[in-house]
Amino acid sequence: MDTTAAPRPDLVELLSATTRRVSRAVATALAEDGGTLEGYRVLRCLAAAPGRTMGQLVAALHLPGPTATRVVDGLVDAALAYRLPDPDDRRRVVVHASALGRTRLARWEALVAGQEAALARSLGEDRVGALVQALTELVDDRD
């Protein structure tokens, strides 16, 4: 019998495992309504600040440029977003959520809220609130 104990997971491993688990659950819920986690994130960003350039989306969402382009292409193909020339620089495009995209986002927000509520039931509202606050501080410190 092996008596060596496995090393206790460190913060990076715990955050990575938690991210994978929560992302998988949210992605599964969104997929039931034809959505993706990345598409949801992009639409949320567009709803919060309409008229974002691709560079702004990449920076705000911490996505690689090609991934952001692929996600926006999918949203445009599904009529959930559209592109217009940037009024300040005609060489660039500005991405907007369409009316259909805003409607779909409202449904996706409800699905994500359901996943967040399940997490709150599992851990407790206070602990989830403290976790959100701590993670927000970490992200704000990095930006």
Predicted regions and their residues:
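Charged, amphipathic alpha-helical coiled-coil/dimerization segments
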Residues: D73-Q133
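A broad helix-preferring feature
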Residues: S23, M54, T69-V76, V95
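Short, locally clustered residues in the helix-turn-helix/winged-helix DNA-binding domain
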Residues: T19, R44-A48, E109, T136
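Short amphipathic alpha-helical segments with heptad-repeat character
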Residues: V12, S16, R20, H62, ...
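N-terminal helix-turn-helix DNA-binding core of bacterial DNA-binding proteins
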Residues: R24-T67
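N-terminal leader segment of winged-helix/HTH proteins
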Residues: M1-D33
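C-terminal regulatory/oligomerization modules of transcriptional regulators
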Residues: M1-A6, D126-D143
